[in-house]
Structure formats: structure tokens, C-alpha cells
Amino acid sequence: MNHTVQTFFSPVNSGQPPNYEMLKEEHEVAVLGAPHNPAPPTSTVIHIRSETSVPDHVVWSLFNTLFMNPCCLGFIAFAYSVKSRDRKMVGDVTGAQAYASTAKCLNIWALILGILMTILLIVIPVLIFQAYG
């Protein structure tokens, strides 16, 4: 067996900086820059889902429940709004959107029926008073 010892560092420092050699690979990378491949460069796109804003219509449902509640539509809309908020807190965006859509539809109907009932409760007594008064 051949045992030879190679020293990579000189034991004596004469006060001058060591002599560095430029390696061929380092020189080529510095001169050439980016590698030249025949294939076009590819890119990776990462989609990070931002928190989707799902309106739960709780305030609107509460308004319809307290002030105009024809056929209990406001109360039912409030229940669906709370379910939508619960689904959103869990992270189920699809379920939250489904419950919110139902709550919105119920709120629209509750508002329309409430306005119609209010108008009729004002118009009918006025018409009766004019007819018999």
C-alpha cells in the first residue's frame, strides 16, 4: 500500500495572501451566465387561495326577523345565515355559499312581502275611510 500525505495548507504564513487558482468550472459559469438549453424555460405557478369573502347576511336576516317577519321568513333566513357563518368558520366555503344563497333568497322574499304588507295595511284603511267617511 502506498501511503502518501498531501498537505493542502502551507504551515508557514509569510504575510502574503495565498495564491488562488481559478477553476475552469467557475470561470465558465461567470462568462456564460445562464445555461443554454434547447428546451424553453418552464415556470411553476403556485395559486394561494386568499380567504374568500362569503356574505352571510346575518344583519339583514336579523332586521327581517325583528321588523318584517311575514310567514317567519326572516327567522328562517336568520337560521340559514347562522349556518352560513358556521360553515365559513369551519372553512367550508362551498357550504357557506350555499347557505348564504338560501338566506339571501329568503331575505328578499321576506323584504318584498313585508313591504307589500306594510303598504296594504296603510292603503286599505285609507280606502275604507274614504269610502265610508
From Swiss-Prot:
Biological-process GO terms, alphabetical: defense response to virus; host-mediated suppression of symbiont invasion; immune response; negative regulation of viral genome replication; negative regulation of viral transcription; response to interferon-alpha; response to interferon-beta; response to type II interferon
Record PTM Phosphotyrosine, positions in chain: Y20
Result, substituting L23Q: Accumulates at the plasma membrane. Loss of anti-SARS-CoV-2 activity by enhancing Spike-mediated cell-to-cell fusion
Annotated membrane topology: Single-pass type II membrane protein
Region entry Interaction with SPP1, spans: 60-93
Cysteines engaged in disulfide bonds, as pairs: none
Glycyl lysine isopeptide (Lys-Gly) (interchain with G-Cter in ubiquitin) crosslink, residue number(s): K24, K83, K88, K104
Keyword Cytoplasm: yes
Cytoplasmic side: 1-57, 79-107
Extracellular side of membrane: 129-133
Keyword Phosphoprotein: yes
Cited Pfam families: CD225
Intramembrane segments as residue ranges: 58-78
Induction remark: By IFN-alpha and IFNG/IFN-gamma.
Recorded consequence of changing C105A: Loss of anti-HCV activity. Only localizes at the lysosome. No effect on SARS-CoV-2 infection. Loss of anti-influenza A virus activity
Modification after translation (UniProt): Palmitoylation on membrane-proximal cysteines controls clustering in membrane compartments and antiviral activity against influenza virus and hepatitis C virus (HCV). Has no effect on anti-SARS-CoV-2 activity.
Keyword terms of this UniProt record: Antiviral defense, Cell membrane, Cytoplasm, Endosome, Immunity, Innate immunity, Isopeptide bond, Lipoprotein, Lysosome, Membrane, Palmitate, Phosphoprotein, Signal-anchor, Transmembrane, Transmembrane helix, Ubl conjugation
Top-level taxon in the UniProt lineage: Eukaryota
InterPro entries, per the entry: CD225/Dispanin_fam, IFITM_antiviral_protein
Region (Interaction with VAPA): 108-133
Residues annotated as transmembrane: 108-128
Role summary: IFN-induced antiviral protein which disrupts intracellular cholesterol homeostasis. Inhibits the entry of viruses to the host cell cytoplasm by preventing viral fusion with cholesterol depleted endosomes. May inactivate new enveloped viruses which buds out of the infected cell, by letting them go out with a cholesterol depleted membrane.
Family: Belongs to the CD225/Dispanin family.
Protein name stated in the entry: Interferon-induced transmembrane protein 3
Lineage per the UniProt record: Eukaryota, Metazoa, Chordata, Craniata, Vertebrata
Gene responsible for this protein: IFITM3
